Structure formats: structure tokens, C-alpha cells
Amino acid sequence: MQDVPYADLAAEHRAPPQRNTLGKASVYAIFICWTLFAVFVYSRYSQLGDARAYMSGGYDDEASARTYMVTQIATTLIGLLRVDVLAHLAFSMFAATGVAYMVGQARVHGHYRWPLLALLLTPSFGVWASVVGRESLYIGCLGFFMGAMVGYFRARGMHRLLFAMVALAGMVFIRAPFGGAMALFFVMAWMLMRGPRVGLSLGVQMMVLLALGALAIVIAWPQLDDYIAGEVLPKARSYFTIYSDSTRMWINIQTSRELFTSLWWTLPLAVVGPTPGEVFARPVLFPFFVSGLVVFFLLLYAIQQAFRAPKGLPRKILVLGWLPAMLVTLISYVPFGVYNAGSGIRYASCFLLFLVFPWMLRSALAATAEQPAALRRPRDFHQYRLAELR
């Protein structure tokens, strides 16, 4: 029987094998494949209307500033590259770079990579993340933001904090409601990581957060109600209440109360997207129906992972920071995702990457705990690693 040195055994179990890591090249390859699929396959069955309008300058100068910016970027790329698919690839590579940066900062490895891969391989995310449009720009900014926040938790550094703020500004500019939810997460995560230690349990802090949130809603309710009923809901109806195989003419949400009281069924409907009946009427939606189911169960699994994170700061960041931001994101998405399944898929692609943040944070924790002691910051990462292994 051959003796195996204990040091070799320890080294083998300390660092994950290279084949178990998610490489940045794989991320870029996935986005390139989605771009080619969207341009040469998907566009034959469903229009890439917004992407074509951006590249052709279809939106006039009277459009919003963010639409004008995307139009200028797209038309400039078309003028330089002369080929539509190359312009799509340019937007796709920006989104891929953001995701690759997040993967690098989180040191994604082992079982932590599977939820991210499941998301990257779903059509509801991949198609719109890989073509010209606001979605690919937002996803790139979100990837940079998530990577900077994970990196700041792992190694601190003012440059990461500033980078996160720049990416956050980009998200607020491109998609204000979703960007506002990310701003909430940024503030909560920063307070938990850098603020004073209050010595309260997670349950007590959750109750305090709920009380403060309820108080803020009560104080701001008149303005919030006017904004939702006077701007958000009419805009959503005007966007999508046109005849289409994927337009739900039977839905009509007119007041803030109707929006919040119907969340028990409108939220799952908006997240999943096409229903079986809509898929039967329009078979091209079948891959997106499957993707919607994957996203829905991934959301439930992510919530479970947040509460199962190692005790202390990691769990507080996820429960007190990520979970409220995710809730605000989903509620703000419902008016734009429930009326039209096809358009809702495009809107949802912006924030789907945020679903995998619990695994990114836990992957960074596990990878940091496995580093040699001389390379680690003086924090009790071994305690977190033991919690991950339980």
C-alpha cells in the first residue's frame, strides 16, 4: 500500500481543481453564441424591433436621454463596423465583460457556478443580453456592480467602492426603477460592512428594517400613489395594450391598491412569462416558458440560499440587503411584465443576473477561506468555510 503525504491530501482539498472553476473565456463564448443565435435564428421567428430601431436611428431626438444615448452608440458602431452582427457583438461583449468581471471577483468555482450557468444558458436572459439595446448595457453595468460589491466584501478597497458607484449610476440612468433597487442594496450592504456594529441579531434587525420601511411608505404614500397610478400604470398599459398573440387584454390594473393586492398572482405570472395557453398559440415562446420556470425556481432557491448563508455579515448582507432589493425590483417589474409576455421577457433580462448574487458572495467566501494565511486579510473566513461545508 502506497503512503500518501498528508500535506498533499490537504492541498488537494484546500483548492478546487481548475476544471471546477468557471473561466472568463467560457462567459465570452456563451455570449457570442447567444448573439449568433439571436441574429441568425431567433430573428427569423420574432422581431428584434428595438435593436433594429436603435441601429437605424429610428428613435428621434425627442426621445428620452437614455434612448438617445443607446441610439447614438448603435448608429456610431454601424457607421464604423458596417455589419449589423458586429454591432450586436459589441453590445454583447460589454455585457459579457461585466459578467466576467463578476465571475473573477467572486472566484466562481465548484457548485457555486451551476446557478450562474443555468441563468446564462436560458433564452430569456441570453437573447436580450447579447443584442443591441438597453438590456445588454444594463446587464454589463450590473455585472460590474455585483463584481465590485463582492470584491469589496472580500478585500475592501476604495477603488472597488467607487467602481460600484459608477456602475450604479449607469444602471439608474438606463433603467431607473431597477437601478433604484440596486441603490437600496448598495446603501444597505455598505452600512452592514462599514457601519457601526449594533450587536443585534438578524431577526431583530429584520424587524427594525420592516418597521422603518413601513414608516417610510406611510410617509411617502401620497407621492408614491400618485406616481404609480398616474405614471407607471398608464405607461405600462400604453406600451403593451395592442393586439398581439402575447398581449393579455384581460388584465387591467388601474390603481396602486390593485397592483399590490394582485401581486400574489401577477408576480409569478410576470416572472414565468408565457403561460401554456400562450405557448400553444405561439410555439416560438416555448423556450421562454421553460426559461421562466427555471428563473422562478432559481428565485426560490436563491431566497433559501440567502437564509442558509453563514451566520454573521454574509447572511445579513443577503437577508437585509439583497432580499429587499430583489423584492423592490420584482414589484417594479410587474407592471411591465404582466401585460405582454414577449416584452416582459426583455424587461426581465435586465435584473435576472442579480438572482445569482447569493452564490457569488458565498463562492467568494469559500475561495477566500481556502487561500494561504499570508494572502488573506485578517478575518475569520475559516468560520465561514466551515459553515459552507455543513
Where would I find each of the regions flagged by the language model?
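Alpha-helical transmembrane segments and terminal signal-anchor/GPI-anchor hydrophobic tails
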Residues: 44-45, 49, 55, 175-310
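Short hydrophobic/aromatic helix or loop-helix immediately within or flanking a transmembrane segment
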Residues: 52-84, 266-270
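Loop-to-helix entry region of an early transmembrane alpha helix in multi-pass inner-membrane enzymes
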Residues: 68, 80-97, 288-293
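Transmembrane-helix motifs of polytopic, lipid-linked glycan transferases
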Residues: 89-109, 297-301
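Transmembrane-helix signature of polytopic, membrane-embedded enzymes
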Residues: 102-123
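Membrane-interface transmembrane helices that cradle and orient dolichyl/undecaprenyl
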Residues: 106-110, 145-160
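Membrane-interface alpha helices of multi-pass inner-membrane proteins
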Residues: 126-128, 160-183, 187
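Short acidic/glycine- and proline-prone juxtamembrane loop motifs at membrane-interface regions
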Residues: 130-138
